[in-house]
Amino acid sequence: MKKRQEVYDLYWYFACERQNIFIKKLNGEPAPWTNDKILQEYKFCNSYRVNDRVSQYLLKNVIYNGKKYSDEDMLFRILLFKLFNKESTWELLLNNFEDITLKTFDVKAYSKTLESAILNGTKIYNDAYISCANKAFGYDRKHENHLALLNKMFNEDKMQSKIVKCKTMEQAFNIIKSYPLIGNFMAYQLVTDINYSEVVNWKEDEFTVAGPGSLRGIKKCFIDKGKMNNEDIIRYMYEHQDKEFKRLNLDFKKIGNRPLQLIDCQNIFCELDKYCRQALPDLKSNRTKIKKHYVPKKERIEYIYPKKWKI
């Protein structure tokens, strides 16, 4: 394994500085929360995936909304939300059906509600999210195929009864990725979100999948991976985080007593790729610009975490 030291050190700097920004905003400090011009100008995900807006919405409105749900309803709710990954789409369905459960799930009715939203010019999918679009179930519209997928998973195959029996994240990942419209990275995101709930309690440090953005980040960070694969590299970062923060004199502020997890280390590679487009433009890359500028949101988020994390 051969590191590109400048980029490797930037990985740890970025993780620490992005977390510092999060903490300062959380404490109500005024902007700018950093002297880093790139972090001031462009939008970057949090160092901890769970602190991102959509993850927080999922926790508060889909999983821990104060109501009791059966395991199968909870799994259904998480997958439905994540296939669209957009708060307004969830709220649209919630306003049209008494609650989002398998009992109220009707492919035609849900589809009709979403179709009229599209005709009114409403976006029902999150732009930043890769969700496979093909006509796997024979429909022209992406949302119809996704609803048909949920119907196959939960009503026809009773996939929920297999998921609750899974002992590891990887077992569940293999079940979910066997379905059409679900790629490896999407399946990894879904099992991570399921693991936020009380339905399962899988270990987080046993399994990871490198997404497209993180592959670009890894390529910039390592000149040669040696005998390691991309997932080994992510695990290497996870296992060496304390040592590296110390080496670089970086005071990384954990949430509770929780270090960065494999999925966080994976995500940081993706953000590092974006950061390097501005910081080190000479590095060879297929993508040369960061698409999104930072726009401050007015409403403050009250952060919550899965109960089992004891934060």
Where would I find each of the regions flagged by the language model?
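Structure-specific DNA junction-binding interface
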Residues: 1-136, 308-311
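Active-site-proximal structural scaffolding
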Residues: 71, 165, 169, 207-211
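Generic structural signal for hydrophobic core residues of well-folded globular domains
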Residues: 78-86, 153, 176-179, 194, ...
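Helix-hairpin-helix/helix-loop-helix acidic hairpins
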Residues: 131-180
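Active-site-adjacent structural elements in folded domains
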Residues: 155-163, 171-177, 198-202, 241-249, ...
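Helix-hairpin-helix
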Residues: 172-194, 214-215
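Phosphate-backbone recognition surface of nucleic-acid-processing proteins
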Residues: 194-250
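Low-complexity, acidic/Ser/Thr- and charged residue-rich accessory regions of DNA metabolism proteins
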Residues: 245-311
